[in-house]
Swiss-Prot record:
Organism of provenance: Mus musculus
Family under the similarity heading: In the N-terminal section; belongs to the glutamate 5-kinase family. In the C-terminal section; belongs to the gamma-glutamyl phosphate reductase family.
Pfam families according to UniProt: AA_kinase, Aldedh
Protein name per its UniProtKB record: Delta-1-pyrroline-5-carboxylate synthase
GO biological process: amino acid biosynthetic process; citrulline biosynthetic process; glutamate metabolic process; L-proline biosynthetic process; ornithine biosynthetic process; proline biosynthetic process; response to temperature stimulus
Subunit annotation: Can form homodimers/multimers.
Keyword Nucleotide-binding assigned: yes
Amino acid sequence: MLRHMHRSGVQPFRQRLLPWVQSIAVPRSNRVQPSAIRHVRSWSNIPFITVPLSRAHGKPFAHRSELKHAKRIVVKLGSAVVTRGDECGLALGRLASIVEQVSVLQNQGREMMLVTSGAVAFGKQRLRHEILLSQSVRQALHSGQNHLKEMAIPVLEARACAAAGQSGLMALYEAMFTQYSICAAQILVTNLDFHDEQKRRNLNGTLHELLRMNIVPIVNTNDAVVPPAEPNSDLQGVNVISVKDNDSLAARLAVEMKTDLLIVLSDVEGLFDSPPGSDDAKLIDIFYPGDQQSVTFGTKSRVGLGGMEAKVKAALWALQGGTSVVIANGTHPKVSGHVITDIVEGKKVGTFFSEVKPAGPTVEQQGEMARSGGRMLATLEPEQRAEIINHLADLLTDQREEILLANKKDLEEAEGRLASPLLKRLSLSTSKLNSLAIGLRQIAASSQESVGRVLRRTRIAKNLELEQVTVPIGVLLVIFESRPDCLPQVAALAIASGNGLLLKGGKEAAHSNRILHLLTQEALSIHGVKEAIQLVNTREEVEDLCRLDKIIDLIIPRGSSQLVRDIQKAAKGIPVMGHSEGICHMYVDSEASVDKVTRLVRDSKCEYPAACNALETLLIHRDLLRTPLFDQIIDMLRVEQVKIHAGPKFASYLTFSPSEVKSLRTEYGDLEVCIEVVDSVQEAIDHIHKYGSSHTDVIVTENEKTAEFFLQHVDSACVFWNASTRFSDGYRFGLGAEVGISTSRIHARGPVGLEGLLTTKWLLRGQDHVVSDFSEHGSLKYLHENLPVPQRNFS
């Protein structure tokens, strides 16, 4: 059966049909209006473009990243996705979202097909309505709504519901697709349509013609007349899957139409290694057919004919036929709004079926290895952790040539693709490696008093003593851009603090990161904790990593302000330590020393302009304008080829001035600086609080009282007097190295070294103590005596 909705006459037809559909199928409070289905260009975050799609159907895709090349896609909507929780009526919000995503992909030039359930649920609601209308007023009042539901549902035969619901279901799909100027066509099939050669050819030809005409076929089993399912059999020497449910229908259709991708939406996140909900159930990211023995299936979903086992069998059959398959959740409110488009973009959603066995451990497995290795690190003696770090420092100098050779490859590949500041961060040198080695040895020396240090001791009562001790945070995820020197720094801090570590570097530093990680694991191997630090594959998307809240305890981003903001937005369940911007200020007071100012400005701005602690805004007291000191500052900046941007007040003082700055809240990261004029130290502080990023701010003055006022009132992580902003650094602070700079208000702030990667736990030692002993009539009293903290001997 083929029902084609033509473009001509759609609007009058929809106006006649939609009120009928709503009145029969949808309660008044839940009715969908055409205006409520927003246009794709204003609602979706998927680019509205035509993507280059030239894939010829053959082998299925090997990796998720290749799914963006899929041209022909089948989306199967399970009963649990389409229907409401009461199994009587449709989930209109989810359907509208699915239709929009399918429309987005269709308008990108892809060929979309839907295999949908929902006719039975739609018909069940309509027939309930008919039963209600056929009752007398006395019967209706007597039965009540709840009694009607109990009475009507058992006697409604599924085939009758399907017959009553098909037309309404298609009318609803038509109304939704019309909002995106897309036509849809309904095709009802049975198993016989695939077994009869002539019918197969007719079906195939019809579908191809619809796709050629840019029409979305909506396919469903003809449940009103469907015969009992037949066993899988051979058809002309080819193993075929019998159409038992919409899972098998979708698989059969995908292979028959040589589809690139089959997306199966259900009410679970994907395929688990054991029934979802069980304590040890883990979502399988990539399923390889050879791993079937590792999966235990549970019961089927609350509605529909198939369960997860049926979906997997259908998926494997489609995969064998050359179609890639993803099983995902189409009901979860946090992900269902973009689940289809996210899958096509290659994001880590659901379970991806691949004929290529995953190489190496998954990121989840790497996280577990890092946690286990971190716990082993924490149990090592302080001297052993220090020995690992010192060995890594030696390797950095001993293997200098290999490291620089790998870094040279990265620089050559990045030439012309990366901006100058990023290339500077990417570059390694002999001096950088020597500085790294020195910093690592400082960390090794300080690590001996990190893990297990007693911070507080309290005698709660007689023979009941409490201790607060330092412990590792757990598993850290450090994401860094273009800075391979970050890897050994962070690794050393993780080793010293006993934390497991996942490292995610940018692909621009892949060669450098690989060799540095190998050297790190070589150092860890001397005490058998090689797995504590893992380098995450560059294929892993940062957004996907930020969802691993059961594995990762803290995320530390090292990179651009945009990277930090993106991670803070994505990591809703995991704390993020870092700063999104490094807008550092220097205020030159009216009593500043002429000899000091130019040195401080030059060092803060020109020594390393790409650093997050480089000067970005120079605030100058009004009294210094048109003075020799001001002229010296301007001349020095010109000699250093620093581009000057004028703030609004500064521009007003000049007849001919640099272009006025577009924003006073700008991190340039290059040889550019904003100059603004202020009337007082208080105005400078107010400016910093309004436009700064709470990173590092400096005052240059010879007036101690003014300086102390500035130091006490500026609310930034680092506040300096007569010192360069570039001192805001873990190595220069004597921390050995830093894992990053934090501008947050809790836990660590400023340059974060070893102490920032530790938390605490409480140890209580008693002798059969119970709370009732301390009641009004109990035998014990609280003492709460402070006890001396033992000093550990590290000599």
